[in-house]
Amino acid sequence: MIVYMHIEINTQNSTLRTDNAELVNALYELYSFKVQGYQYSRAYKSHRWDGSKRFFNRKGVFRTGLLTRVLSDLKKVDCSPDLVDNRTVNTNHSDYQLDNITYYPYQEETIQKCLQEKRLVVKAPTGSGKTLIIGGIVKALRDRKMVILFNAKQLLNQTYEFLTEVCNLENIGVCFGEGYIYGDIMLCTVQSIDKILDTHLEDTEVLLVDECHEFCNGKTTLAAIESFPKANYRFGFTATTPSNSIPKYNLEGAIGPVHSVVTTSDLVEDGKLTKPIIQLIDRPYSASGADEDMSYLEVYEEYIVKNEERNNTIKEIVNDIKEKNKRARILILTKSLDHGRTLENLLGVECSSFLEGADSLSERYQAISRFRGCRDSSVLIGTKILQTGINIEEITHFINARAMKSEIATLQALGRALRKHETKERVFVYDFLDKEKYLGSHARERRKHYKKEKHEVVIL
């Protein structure tokens, strides 16, 4: 029999207090997950650690962002604890409407839900107007100290321009490697977060995290989104949430529960995104068993980067597109720099550019401008820097040459090509059904990711 049970809620951590030790132990085990590769750890081998990360400790303490999940699990066993909320939250907010901008219904509903719930991971596909949602939240809460975290300077710059030039908001500051402008509302890359600790760590009431899935694994990035002890408004934004338990619980614990805004297929059906035709090229197995004793890196180098047959297929696709289209805009994404340079040399076409992380922002914008403005068909080759944060609506064809497994990487890359533009009614996507060790399972995963989003998939 339970004599007492209540949850004390604070900004960063909350605590379940009860005399039912069995219940606490059950939650301790339920919120425990094995860390990948734990069996190789010295601590595990010496029996000093069981290989688990725990999100609910033996004293009943857990991250407040997991409160909704904990309450749901308690309800399953007919437990309804009293809630003691120790937070001091200013629930007043200003109007979130932006001048000369009309929200889609799902955008306005998301802003309203964020202001009501105060802690949410907003799952919104590429092209759904995530930055517009951020703008509405910032305007509504603009009288508070606020931090918006980014993992890339390019995303920060785009958001700064939107908030200041489109939304006409004031008191907006920026902080990144070589730049600093103070503002009560501070846009900051996680790499430069140390520069705002004195001014914003203790007083920030609102924390927003762009591309928040990028923050839930690294020690520094996770520590950043778990900080800010007075930030009772906490919002993350991503197109794809983590599927593995540890990063998923890291993210929810620091921010809050996931709220799905709308699906990509919904946006396509409503005419807000371009319909993709995904074509999977069925490649023959070319390793003849030589891949069996190779590591992943060796397989990738041999059968992706240096694979002449596969690379020549990409060249043939590009040539075929150019023959059939006068002004095609072809995006090719690679995982490695060497692969990008190999394809650049192989294609050797005019109006072709290769972008990498080392390129400055001005170099990137110049390359994108050339890509857009070419009178004939043009090709843009890039690495991960083109996966997120770059809006090139003119893309008509997308070749995913990376052979990656990740759902996040696959769908974010696809999202680059789906934005609407007057020059296209559909976008053609090319990917590969590779067969070699590791690559075969990764190809099947990508196919599954495409189908999960209800896209049309054709095998060539």
Describe each region flagged by the PLM.
Residues 131-165, 243, 335-338:
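Conserved Walker A/P-loop ATP-binding site and its immediately adjacent core
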Residues 157, 170-182, 329-333, 341-342, ...:
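Conserved helicase ATPase core of P-loop NTP-dependent helicases/translocases
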Residues 289-335, 341-346:
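Conserved interdomain hinge at the start of the Helicase C-terminal
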